Design a protein with these regions (language model features):
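Core beta-strand elements of the Rossmann-like FAD/NAD(P) dinucleotide-binding domain
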Residues: 83-92, 213-222, 257
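Mid-to-C-terminal Rossmann-like scaffold of FAD/NAD(P)H-dependent oxidoreductases
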Residues: 270-373, 418-429
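A conserved short coil-to-beta-strand element within the FAD-binding core of flavoproteins
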Residues: 63-74, 194-206
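Glycine-rich dinucleotide-binding loop and its adjacent helix/turn
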Residues: 92-155, 191, 244-245, 250-252
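Rossmann-like dinucleotide-binding cores of NAD(P)H-dependent redox enzymes
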Residues: 145-200, 285-286, 303-325
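Cysteine/selenocysteine-centered motifs that mediate thiol-based redox chemistry or coordinate metal-sulfur cofactors
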Residues: 388-429
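FAD-site-proximal beta/loop scaffold in flavoenzymes
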Residues: 111-133, 217-293
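Beta1-alpha1 glycine-rich phosphate/pyrophosphate-binding loop at the start
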Residues: 1-59, 151-173
C-alpha cells in the first residue's frame, strides 16, 4: 500500500507504524537462507533494505506497538521500545497487521524453544537456536511446514513433521499429487507423523516435548509452529464490524464500518466465486493486491471487485508444486465433479497436472501441479481461468503457442484440458 500510494501521491504524508524494525521482511526468510538463495536474513526484504532506514523526509516511520485504536477520537495509543506510551492522531487509518500462527488447542509452557519464524526479529532469534539444534519438531504439515521441514533437512537437521490430518497439505492437495513428495521425505531425514493432533508443548530437562490428543509424545531440541494463521484483529474488535472468524468486514473498497478505517491483506476475507462464499486466504499475493487496490481507490481510481481463487505454490523435496481453487475432495462436498490427472515424463522430468471441473458444465474449479522443473508459471494462467469461469472446452480449443522443445507447458495444458473434456463428456453420455 505505502509504495503504491507514494507513487500516486508523492506529496502525501504517510505515517507508517510497526513494532517490527523491518516490517518489509519476507515471512519465513529462513527458508531462503537455508537453501542458499540469500547470504543473510537481512537480505530477505521486500524490494530493498530494512524499510525503517528508507523512509523519505515527508513520511514518518514510528517503531512502536499499537496498544489501542480509539476510533471515536481518531487516535492511536502507542508504546515504543523504551516503554514510553504516547498518542498519535490520524485522518485515515489503514490496518495491515497481518496474521500470526494461532491455535486454540495447543498449550505451550513459557519457553524460548517453541519458535515462529514469520517476522524478522523472531527469525533472528530462532536462527541461533536452530543452528545449535539437531532434532526439530515442526507442528503442521501444510505448505509452511513442508517448506520448513525441507529447509531444515538441508542443514542436516533431523525433522519430525507432525500433522493432525492424514497427509501433508491436506487442504490444498489431493492424495495422488502429494504421494511422490511423501516418498521423498524419508530420504531427507524427515519423519512424517500423521493423524496426531498436538495439544501441548512443554520444555522438560532442556528438551521440548509435544503431547498429542491421541496420548503420544514426541521429543526434540526445538519446536516450530507452522499451524493455521489467524488475523491480528484484536485491536479492532468492538471498533468495527467483524466476522465470526475474526476477519474484518469490508465493502468493495476495503472500507470498514468506520468510514475512515480500512483493512487489507490478512485482515480480510475475499469472495471465493467457485464456492460462492467469502474465504480467508492469508497469502502474500492477497496482501499485495488489496494494498495496491486500496492505494488506487484512495487516489481516486475506480477498482474492480476483488476476489480470490487461492493460488499457491512452493518448492521442496525435489518438486515444484502449485494448487489453484479447490481440491477434488473439497469440491465434492458441494457439487458433482469430473477430474483428470495428466502425467508426462519420467522420474527425472516428471510433469503432472490435475484438473477438476464442475461435471454439469465443465467450468474449471481446481488444479494441482507437480513437476521436477519449475512450471509454477502455469498456476497464474489457471488462476485466471478459474476467476473467469472458463470451461475445459474453452481451454482445450483456444489458440496456444507451439514451438517444438520450447513451449512444452502450453502443449501440456492443452492436452490436459482436452483429456478432461473427453472424460467429462463420456461420463455425461
Amino acid at each position: 500500500f505505502v509504495d503504491k500510494y507514494k507513487d500516486l501521491n508523492p506529496d502525501s504524508q504517510i505515517i507508517l507504524i510497526d513494532k517490527e524494525s523491518c516490517p518489509n521482511y519476507i515471512p519465513n526468510g529462513i527458508n531462503q537462507l537455508f537453501r542458499g538463495d540469500i547470504q543473510d536474513l537481512s537480505d530477505a526484504m521486500w524490494g530493498r533494505a530494512c524499510l525503517a532506514a528508507q523512509i523519505e523526509s515527508n513520511h514518518r516511520f514510528i517503531q512502536a506497538e499499537v496498544l489501542a485504536i480509539e476510533a471515536p477520537s481518531n487516535t492511536l495509543l502507542l508504546k515504543d521500545s523504551q516503554g514510553r506510551v504516547f498518542e498519535e492522531g490520524y485522518e485515515t487509518l489503514v490496518c495491515a497487521m497481518g496474521a500470526s500462527p494461532q491455535s486454540h488447542y495447543i498449550e505451550t509452557s513459557q519457553t524460548n524453544k517453541v519458535l515462529v519464524t514469520k517476522y524478522y526479529e523472531e527469525s533472528q532469534a530462532s536462527l541461533k537456536l536452530i543452528e545449535a539444534s539437531q532434532e526439530v519438531l515442526v507442528i503442521g504439515a501444510g505448505l509452511i511446514g513442508l517448506d520448513l521441514a525441507y529447509s531444515l533437512s538441508l542443514q542436516g537437521k533431523r525433522v519430525k513433521l507432525i500433522e493432525a490430518a492424514e497427509r501433508p497439505d491436506f487442504y490444498q492437495t489431493d492424495a495422488e499429487l502429494i504421494a511422490p513428495v511423501m516418498a521423498e521425505m524419508s530420504t531427507h531425514h524427515v519423519t512424517f507423523i500423521n493423524n496426531k493432533r498436538v495439544t501441548a508443548i512443554h520444555e522438560i530437562e532442556g528438551k521440548v516435548v509435544a503431547h498429542t490428543e491421541q496420548g503420544d509424545t514426541f521429543q526434540g531440541d526445538l519446536a516450530i509452529l507452522a499451524i493455521n494463521f489467524r488475523p491480528n484483529t484484536h485491536l479492532l474488535q468492538g471498533q468495527v464490524a467483524c466476522a465470526l472468524d475474526k476477519t474484518i468486514l469490508v465493502n468493495e473498497n476495503l472500507q470498514t464500518s468506520q468510514a475512515n478505517i480500512y483493512a487489507i491483506g490478512d485482515m480480510v476475507s475475499l469472495h471465493f466465486g467457485i464456492l460462492g462464499m467469502d474465504y480467508y486466504t492469508p497469502l502474500i499475493n492477497q496482501a499485495m493486491k488489496t494494498g495496491q487496490a486500496l492505494a488506487l481507490h484512495l487516489a481516486g481510481y475506480p477498482i474492480p471487485p476483488l476476489q480470490t481463487v487461492k493460488v499457491l505454490g512452493s518448492s521442496h523435496f525435489g518438486y515444484y508444486r502449485a494448487s489453484v481453487g479447490v481440491t477434488e475432495e473439497e469440491a465434492e462436498l458441494y457439487m458433482d465433479t469430473c477430474s483428470y490427472l495428466y502425467q508426462n515424463g519420467d522420474s527425472k522430468n516428471l510433469f503432472w497436472l490435475k484438473l477438476i471441473a464442475r461435471k454439469t458444465d465443465g467450468i474449471l474449479i481446481g488444479a494441482q501441479l507437480l513437476s521436477k522443473t519449475n512450471a509454477l508459471v502455469i498456476a497464474n494462467q489457471l488462476g485466471q481461468a478459474l476467476a473467469l469461469k472458463v470451461t475445459d472446452a474453452d481451454l482445450a480449443f483456444q489458440d496456444f503457442l507451439f514451438l517444438q522443445g520450447h513451449s512444452d507447458l502450453a502443449y501440456h495444458l492443452h492436452e490436459a484440458c482436452l483429456k478432461l473434456f473427453e472424460k467429462r463428456l463420456r461420463h455425461e453420455d
